[in-house]
Structures are given as structure tokens and as C-alpha cells.
Amino acid sequence: MSEENKLSESEIKEEAVQTLERINFWISNCDTKISFSLAFAGILLGGFFSSGIITGSLNKLMKGLKEIDKDTPYLKIQYLEITTIVLVVFIILMIVSLTYLFRGKKGSIDTGVFNEADLSKDSILFFGTIQNKSFISFKNSVIEIKKDDLVNDYLSQVYINSKICNRKFTLYNKGVNWLIASTIVFIILNGMFLFL
């Protein structure tokens, strides 16, 4: 690469700042999506546990299971067992979905997990390291920082936040996939409840 095509230090810093802003936007975007998914899961669970039709059907299911005896028709026993299995599957899918979504929503500020050469560990940009300093110490760090160290700090934050963003979206996507599966099972379960 020729020297005239290389970015200057100020251009590198500006690009890093813009990239960091974009990544932070995507992190915020993912948190918003997770919040909407959690709200949907809450509505689904709220509807499940507060609906008179569903609670009535659950009571009928439990009563039907308790009253199974040698005179109960085989198909009725099978239907009650399958309905119970579908109910358990719905609950498990919902728990898995909520676990992924809450893990995605959880903040991650442990920079200790990012141990790579040249990665800035004493950042003047990251609130987690700033809050560990006194104001005087932080102020002196900002005043005394060299240009190349500041650029490295920005690039480090871009790298770390990219990792955080990727983790959030991975957990969000898994959570949504499990939520979709639990919604489908919820619909099937409601259909099965109609025939109890």
C-alpha cells in the first residue's frame, strides 16, 4: 500500500469515533429489540396464566389426568398425555427463550475478558474504567494522553463493543427463535385445549 493512500492519525481517529458510534447504535438497537421480545413473551405468558378459557382448560386437563382409571378410553388417555407433553414443551421453550433474551439484555462491562496485545486496558473512554478512578486521576489521564494512545483507545473500544454487540445479537436471535417455537406450541396447545 502506498503512503499517499494511508489515513492520517486524525482520519483514523475520526473513523474510529464514527465506527464506535455506529456500533453503540446497534447495541442500543439490539437492546430495544430484546425489550420488545420480552414484552411479547410477557403478554404471551400473561394471556396464558390469566385467560379464563386457558385456566379452565388447565383445570380440565388436571382433573382428566387425576380421573384416569381402567374404564377411561385409550384415546382419551393418549390425548391427555399428549396435551400434557405439549404443555411441558411450551413451558420449557418459554424458559429457554427468556434465558437467552435476559442474557442478551444483561450489561457486560468486564473488559478483563478481552486480553489481547495492544488492547487498551486503562481506557479514558469506557465508563467502567473511568468510574474506578478518582476525578483527579481521570482528569490527568485525559490531559496527559498521547494522540496515538487515544487512537488506540478508540480502536480498542470499537473492538470490545463489536464483540459485545455480536454477543447480544447472537443471544437475541437464539431467544427470538425459541420464542417463535414457543408461540407455535402455544397456538397448538390452545387448539388442543378446545377438545378437552
UniProtKB/Swiss-Prot annotation:
Q: Which domain of life is it from?
A: Bacteria
Tagged with keyword Oxidoreductase: no
Any one annotated GO CC term: plasma membrane
Bilayer disposition of the protein: Multi-pass membrane protein
GO molecular function (one): nucleotide binding
Compartment(s) = Cell inner membrane
Q: Which UniProt keywords are given for this protein, alphabetically ordered?
A: Antiviral defense, Cell inner membrane, Cell membrane, Membrane, Nucleotide-binding, Transmembrane, Transmembrane helix
TM region(s), chain numbering: 34-54, 82-102, 176-196
Name by which UniProt lists this protein: Pycsar effector protein GmPycTM
Provide the species name. Answer: Gulbenkiania mobilis
Q: What is the lineage of its organism?
A: Bacteria, Pseudomonadati, Pseudomonadota, Betaproteobacteria, Neisseriales
